[in-house]
């Protein structure tokens, strides 16, 4: 089994910096480190797993793009209402997903 290539969305934030450092420590390949204004759709072909720590307003688009490319997804973004999270989780259920936001 090969090591998955990570796509980190929200790389310039506090958690993004922490995740980049952890990936380096663990020698995990980061295929793309993105932030607001970067092209997630273009970066998806470079990696296997999307880790999203961006803004809650971007979560739906991140899920839609990730599902369309059949990539695994980790969502750490916070600020979603219970109703939003329920709808987004149903959409994300089409691919392997871990939702770690509160």
Regions found by a protein language model. Give the residues of each.
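Short acidic low-complexity segments
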Residues: 34-47
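A short, Lys/Arg-enriched amphipathic alpha-helix followed by its capping loop at the start of a domain
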Residues: 21-28
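Rossmann-fold NAD(P)-binding glycine/threonine-rich loop
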Residues: 63-64, 68-69, 77-100
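Extreme N-terminal starter segment of soluble prokaryotic enzymes
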Residues: 2-6
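N-terminal Rossmann NAD(P)H-binding glycine-rich loop of SDR-like oxidoreductase domains
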Residues: 8-12, 16-21
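N-terminal Rossmann-like NAD(P) cofactor-binding module of classical short-chain dehydrogenase/reductase
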Residues: 50-51, 55
């Amino acid at each position: 089994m090969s090591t998955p290539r990570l796509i980190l969305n929200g790389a310039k934030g506090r958690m993004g910096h922490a995740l980049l450092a952890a990936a380096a420590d663990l020698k995990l390949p980061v295929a793309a480190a993105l932030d607001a204004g970067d092209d997630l759709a273009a970066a998806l072909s470079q990696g296997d797993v999307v880790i999203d720590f961006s803004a809650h307003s971007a979560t739906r688009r991140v899920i839609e793009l990730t599902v369309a490319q059949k990539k695994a997804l980790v969502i750490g973004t916070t600020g979603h209402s219970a109703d939003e999270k329920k709808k987004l989780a149903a959409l994300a259920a089409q691919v392997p997903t871990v939702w770690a936001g509160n």
